[in-house]
Protein backbone atom coordinates (compact mmCIF):
# COMPACT_ATOMS: atom_id res chain seq x y z
CA UNK A 1 0.00 0.00 0.00
CA UNK A 2 2.82 2.40 0.82
CA UNK A 3 4.30 1.89 -2.66
CA UNK A 4 0.94 2.74 -4.23
CA UNK A 5 0.42 5.83 -2.05
CA UNK A 6 3.91 7.14 -2.81
CA UNK A 7 3.53 6.51 -6.54
CA UNK A 8 6.20 3.82 -6.78
CA UNK A 9 3.50 1.56 -8.21
CA UNK A 10 0.67 2.74 -10.44
CA UNK A 11 -2.63 1.05 -9.47
CA UNK A 12 -4.72 -0.51 -12.22
CA UNK A 13 -7.36 -2.58 -10.43
CA UNK A 14 -11.08 -2.26 -11.15
CA UNK A 15 -14.09 -2.86 -8.92
CA UNK A 16 -15.88 -6.14 -9.59
CA UNK A 17 -19.08 -4.86 -8.00
CA UNK A 18 -21.09 -1.67 -7.56
CA UNK A 19 -20.93 0.29 -4.30
CA UNK A 20 -24.36 1.82 -3.55
CA UNK A 21 -24.83 5.11 -1.76
CA UNK A 22 -27.05 3.55 0.92
CA UNK A 23 -28.29 0.09 1.79
CA UNK A 24 -31.85 0.98 0.81
CA UNK A 25 -30.64 1.29 -2.79
CA UNK A 26 -29.73 -2.42 -2.98
CA UNK A 27 -32.24 -4.29 -5.19
CA UNK A 28 -32.92 -6.99 -2.56
CA UNK A 29 -33.28 -4.55 0.35
CA UNK A 30 -37.10 -4.85 0.71
CA UNK A 31 -36.97 -8.63 1.28
CA UNK A 32 -33.53 -9.64 2.55
CA UNK A 33 -33.84 -11.13 6.07
CA UNK A 34 -37.50 -10.06 6.21
CA UNK A 35 -38.91 -13.63 6.04
CA UNK A 36 -38.41 -16.54 8.42
CA UNK A 37 -38.42 -19.72 6.35
CA UNK A 38 -37.68 -18.42 2.85
CA UNK A 39 -35.30 -16.14 0.97
CA UNK A 40 -36.98 -14.45 -1.99
CA UNK A 41 -34.86 -13.06 -4.80
CA UNK A 42 -37.55 -11.00 -6.45
CA UNK A 43 -34.95 -8.82 -8.16
CA UNK A 44 -34.42 -11.58 -10.77
CA UNK A 45 -31.84 -10.48 -13.37
CA UNK A 46 -31.50 -6.98 -11.92
CA UNK A 47 -28.39 -7.50 -9.81
CA UNK A 48 -25.50 -5.06 -9.40
CA UNK A 49 -24.96 -2.55 -12.18
CA UNK A 50 -27.77 -4.16 -14.21
CA UNK A 51 -30.24 -2.92 -11.60
CA UNK A 52 -28.69 0.48 -10.93
CA UNK A 53 -28.47 1.25 -14.65
CA UNK A 54 -32.00 0.02 -15.41
CA UNK A 55 -33.63 1.87 -12.51
CA UNK A 56 -31.48 4.98 -12.90
CA UNK A 57 -30.19 4.82 -9.33
CA UNK A 58 -27.08 6.92 -8.51
CA UNK A 59 -24.18 4.93 -7.04
CA UNK A 60 -21.13 5.75 -4.95
CA UNK A 61 -18.65 3.78 -7.07
CA UNK A 62 -19.75 2.09 -10.32
CA UNK A 63 -18.87 -1.40 -11.49
CA UNK A 64 -15.46 -1.38 -13.19
CA UNK A 65 -14.30 1.83 -11.47
CA UNK A 66 -10.60 2.22 -10.70
CA UNK A 67 -7.88 4.80 -10.09
CA UNK A 68 -4.61 5.53 -11.84
CA UNK A 69 -1.81 8.09 -11.76
CA UNK A 70 -2.08 8.46 -15.51
CA UNK A 71 -4.85 8.99 -18.05
CA UNK A 72 -5.94 7.03 -21.11
CA UNK A 73 -7.63 8.02 -24.35
CA UNK A 74 -9.81 5.65 -26.40
CA UNK A 75 -10.19 6.11 -30.17
CA UNK A 76 -10.96 4.50 -33.54
CA UNK A 77 -13.61 1.99 -32.49
CA UNK A 78 -14.45 -0.77 -34.98
CA UNK A 79 -17.21 -3.28 -34.26
CA UNK A 80 -18.15 -6.66 -35.72
CA UNK A 81 -20.57 -9.34 -34.50
CA UNK A 82 -17.73 -11.05 -32.64
CA UNK A 83 -15.46 -8.33 -31.27
CA UNK A 84 -14.60 -4.69 -30.75
CA UNK A 85 -11.29 -3.15 -31.82
CA UNK A 86 -9.97 0.19 -30.62
CA UNK A 87 -6.81 2.17 -29.93
CA UNK A 88 -5.80 3.01 -26.36
CA UNK A 89 -3.25 5.77 -25.69
CA UNK A 90 -1.51 6.66 -22.43
CA UNK A 91 -1.92 10.44 -22.37
CA UNK A 92 -0.28 10.91 -18.97
CA UNK A 93 3.30 11.31 -17.77
CA UNK A 94 3.82 7.90 -16.12
CA UNK A 95 3.50 4.30 -17.23
CA UNK A 96 0.26 2.53 -16.36
CA UNK A 97 -2.19 -0.21 -17.22
CA UNK A 98 -5.82 0.21 -18.22
CA UNK A 99 -8.65 -2.34 -18.10
CA UNK A 100 -10.81 -1.59 -21.14
CA UNK A 101 -14.40 -2.80 -20.76
CA UNK A 102 -16.93 -3.57 -23.50
CA UNK A 103 -20.66 -3.44 -22.74
CA UNK A 104 -23.48 -4.47 -25.06
CA UNK A 105 -26.53 -2.27 -24.59
CA UNK A 106 -29.82 -1.34 -26.17
CA UNK A 107 -32.69 1.10 -25.66
CA UNK A 108 -35.70 -1.20 -26.10
CA UNK A 109 -36.96 -0.90 -22.51
CA UNK A 110 -38.02 -4.54 -22.13
CA UNK A 111 -37.29 -7.20 -19.49
CA UNK A 112 -33.52 -7.07 -19.84
CA UNK A 113 -30.55 -5.09 -18.58
CA UNK A 114 -29.85 -1.87 -20.51
CA UNK A 115 -26.22 -2.97 -20.85
CA UNK A 116 -24.12 -6.00 -19.92
CA UNK A 117 -20.39 -6.55 -19.75
CA UNK A 118 -19.35 -8.76 -22.65
CA UNK A 119 -15.56 -8.51 -22.68
CA UNK A 120 -12.51 -6.73 -21.35
CA UNK A 121 -8.76 -6.46 -21.83
CA UNK A 122 -5.88 -5.08 -19.77
CA UNK A 123 -3.17 -3.18 -21.60
CA UNK A 124 0.03 -1.70 -20.16
CA UNK A 125 1.39 1.45 -21.80
CA UNK A 126 4.35 3.78 -21.38
CA UNK A 127 3.72 7.55 -21.44
CA UNK A 128 2.60 8.55 -24.93
CA UNK A 129 2.39 4.94 -26.14
CA UNK A 130 -0.61 3.63 -28.09
CA UNK A 131 -1.83 0.10 -28.66
CA UNK A 132 -4.46 -1.36 -30.95
CA UNK A 133 -6.42 -4.03 -29.09
CA UNK A 134 -9.20 -6.46 -29.99
CA UNK A 135 -11.73 -7.55 -27.37
CA UNK A 136 -13.87 -10.58 -28.28
CA UNK A 137 -17.45 -10.66 -27.06
CA UNK A 138 -18.54 -13.30 -24.59
CA UNK A 139 -20.09 -16.62 -25.75
CA UNK A 140 -23.62 -15.39 -24.92
CA UNK A 141 -23.30 -11.97 -26.47
CA UNK A 142 -26.58 -10.62 -27.88
CA UNK A 143 -28.45 -13.51 -26.20
CA UNK A 144 -31.12 -14.07 -23.56
CA UNK A 145 -32.36 -17.21 -21.85
CA UNK A 146 -35.72 -18.37 -23.19
CA UNK A 147 -37.56 -20.43 -20.53
CA UNK A 148 -39.96 -21.79 -23.16
CA UNK A 149 -37.13 -23.30 -25.23
CA UNK A 150 -34.94 -23.98 -22.18
CA UNK A 151 -31.92 -22.51 -23.89
CA UNK A 152 -30.11 -19.30 -24.73
CA UNK A 153 -31.24 -17.64 -27.97
CA UNK A 154 -29.83 -14.75 -29.95
CA UNK A 155 -32.09 -11.71 -29.63
CA UNK A 156 -32.53 -9.66 -32.77
CA UNK A 157 -32.40 -5.88 -32.35
CA UNK A 158 -30.10 -2.88 -32.68
CA UNK A 159 -27.40 -2.92 -30.03
CA UNK A 160 -24.99 -0.24 -28.91
CA UNK A 161 -21.44 -1.44 -28.31
CA UNK A 162 -20.12 0.73 -25.48
CA UNK A 163 -16.44 0.86 -24.57
CA UNK A 164 -15.38 2.47 -21.33
CA UNK A 165 -13.26 2.62 -18.22
CA UNK A 166 -16.23 1.62 -16.04
CA UNK A 167 -19.93 0.89 -16.46
CA UNK A 168 -20.62 4.61 -16.09
CA UNK A 169 -17.55 6.02 -17.82
CA UNK A 170 -18.25 5.18 -21.45
CA UNK A 171 -15.75 6.63 -23.92
CA UNK A 172 -16.80 5.20 -27.31
CA UNK A 173 -20.06 3.88 -28.79
CA UNK A 174 -21.12 2.26 -32.05
CA UNK A 175 -24.39 0.64 -33.08
CA UNK A 176 -24.71 -2.79 -34.66
CA UNK A 177 -27.84 -4.55 -35.97
CA UNK A 178 -28.15 -8.21 -34.99
CA UNK A 179 -30.63 -10.65 -36.50
CA UNK A 180 -32.34 -13.11 -34.21
CA UNK A 181 -35.44 -14.00 -32.23
CA UNK A 182 -37.64 -12.14 -29.78
CA UNK A 183 -38.38 -14.42 -26.79
CA UNK A 184 -41.75 -13.78 -25.15
CA UNK A 185 -40.05 -13.41 -21.76
CA UNK A 186 -38.77 -10.00 -22.89
CA UNK A 187 -42.33 -8.67 -23.09
CA UNK A 188 -43.02 -9.14 -19.38
CA UNK A 189 -44.75 -6.07 -17.96
CA UNK A 190 -44.79 -4.29 -14.61
CA UNK A 191 -41.77 -3.92 -12.37
CA UNK A 192 -39.70 -6.35 -14.42
CA UNK A 193 -40.09 -4.15 -17.48
CA UNK A 194 -39.13 -0.93 -15.70
CA UNK A 195 -36.50 -2.44 -13.43
CA UNK A 196 -38.11 -0.89 -10.36
CA UNK A 197 -37.93 -4.23 -8.58
CA UNK A 198 -38.45 -2.75 -5.12
CA UNK A 199 -42.12 -2.79 -6.09
CA UNK A 200 -42.35 -6.38 -7.35
CA UNK A 201 -45.56 -7.92 -6.01
CA UNK A 202 -45.95 -11.51 -4.86
CA UNK A 203 -48.18 -12.11 -7.88
CA UNK A 204 -45.56 -10.81 -10.32
CA UNK A 205 -42.88 -12.97 -8.72
CA UNK A 206 -45.08 -16.07 -8.78
CA UNK A 207 -45.83 -15.45 -12.45
CA UNK A 208 -42.11 -15.15 -13.17
CA UNK A 209 -41.04 -18.36 -11.42
CA UNK A 210 -44.14 -20.26 -12.54
CA UNK A 211 -45.29 -21.59 -9.16
CA UNK A 212 -46.91 -20.36 -5.93
CA UNK A 213 -44.66 -18.93 -3.25
CA UNK A 214 -44.20 -21.07 -0.14
CA UNK A 215 -45.13 -19.61 3.22
CA UNK A 216 -42.45 -17.23 4.48
CA UNK A 217 -43.19 -18.23 8.09
CA UNK A 218 -42.01 -21.20 10.10
CA UNK A 219 -44.78 -23.66 10.94
CA UNK A 220 -45.77 -22.85 14.51
CA UNK A 221 -46.81 -26.39 15.45
CA UNK A 222 -43.83 -28.27 13.97
CA UNK A 223 -41.46 -29.85 16.53
CA UNK A 224 -37.93 -28.49 16.72
CA UNK A 225 -34.93 -30.68 15.94
CA UNK A 226 -31.14 -30.36 15.74
CA UNK A 227 -31.41 -28.62 12.36
CA UNK A 228 -33.87 -25.98 13.58
CA UNK A 229 -32.36 -22.54 14.12
CA UNK A 230 -32.29 -20.71 17.44
CA UNK A 231 -34.69 -18.04 16.17
CA UNK A 232 -37.39 -20.73 16.05
CA UNK A 233 -37.22 -21.30 19.81
CA UNK A 234 -40.60 -20.80 21.47
CA UNK A 235 -42.12 -20.91 24.93
CA UNK A 236 -40.16 -20.15 28.12
CA UNK A 237 -36.87 -21.31 26.59
CA UNK A 238 -37.30 -19.02 23.60
CA UNK A 239 -38.15 -16.08 25.84
CA UNK A 240 -35.10 -16.65 28.05
CA UNK A 241 -32.86 -17.05 24.99
CA UNK A 242 -34.06 -13.80 23.45
CA UNK A 243 -33.60 -11.94 26.74
CA UNK A 244 -30.12 -13.37 27.21
CA UNK A 245 -28.87 -12.52 23.73
CA UNK A 246 -30.42 -9.07 23.96
CA UNK A 247 -28.71 -8.45 27.30
CA UNK A 248 -25.34 -9.46 25.87
CA UNK A 249 -25.86 -7.20 22.86
CA UNK A 250 -26.83 -4.20 25.00
CA UNK A 251 -23.95 -4.83 27.40
CA UNK A 252 -21.42 -4.83 24.59
CA UNK A 253 -22.85 -1.59 23.26
CA UNK A 254 -22.57 0.04 26.68
CA UNK A 255 -18.84 -0.69 26.85
CA UNK A 256 -18.27 0.58 23.32
CA UNK A 257 -17.84 -2.79 21.60
CA UNK A 258 -20.27 -2.12 18.78
CA UNK A 259 -18.69 -4.58 16.34
CA UNK A 260 -18.90 -7.39 18.88
CA UNK A 261 -22.50 -6.39 19.60
CA UNK A 262 -23.35 -6.93 15.93
CA UNK A 263 -21.99 -10.47 16.16
CA UNK A 264 -24.99 -11.41 18.30
CA UNK A 265 -27.10 -11.19 15.14
CA UNK A 266 -25.34 -14.35 13.94
CA UNK A 267 -26.83 -16.32 16.83
CA UNK A 268 -30.36 -16.44 15.47
CA UNK A 269 -29.75 -18.27 12.14
CA UNK A 270 -27.47 -20.78 13.90
CA UNK A 271 -28.87 -24.35 14.14
CA UNK A 272 -29.15 -26.02 17.54
CA UNK A 273 -26.56 -28.61 16.53
CA UNK A 274 -23.94 -25.84 16.42
CA UNK A 275 -24.31 -25.28 20.17
CA UNK A 276 -22.59 -28.60 20.82
CA UNK A 277 -19.54 -27.64 18.74
CA UNK A 278 -19.27 -24.08 20.04
CA UNK A 279 -19.89 -24.62 23.76
CA UNK A 280 -16.62 -26.42 24.61
CA UNK A 281 -18.55 -29.34 26.07
CA UNK A 282 -21.08 -27.33 28.05
CA UNK A 283 -23.87 -28.52 25.73
CA UNK A 284 -23.98 -32.26 25.03
CA UNK A 285 -25.90 -34.21 22.37
CA UNK A 286 -28.13 -35.58 25.11
CA UNK A 287 -29.05 -32.06 26.23
CA UNK A 288 -30.06 -31.19 22.69
Which residues are covered by each model-predicted region?
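Intrinsic-disorder/low-complexity, polar/charged segments enriched in Ser/Thr/Lys/Arg/Asp/Glu/Gln
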Residues: 81-85, 130-134, 171-173
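Secreted, periplasmic, or luminal enzymes acting at the cell surface/secretory milieu
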Residues: 1-97, 103, 156, 160-163
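C-terminal non-catalytic accessory extensions
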Residues: 256-288
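Intrinsically disordered, low-complexity Pro/Gly/Ser/Thr-rich segments with frequent PxxP/GP/PP motifs
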Residues: 109-147
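Charged, amphipathic alpha-helical linkers/stalks
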Residues: 174-243
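Terminal connector regions
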Residues: 139-186
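Short, hydrophobic/aromatic beta-strand segments
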Residues: 95-102, 113, 145-148
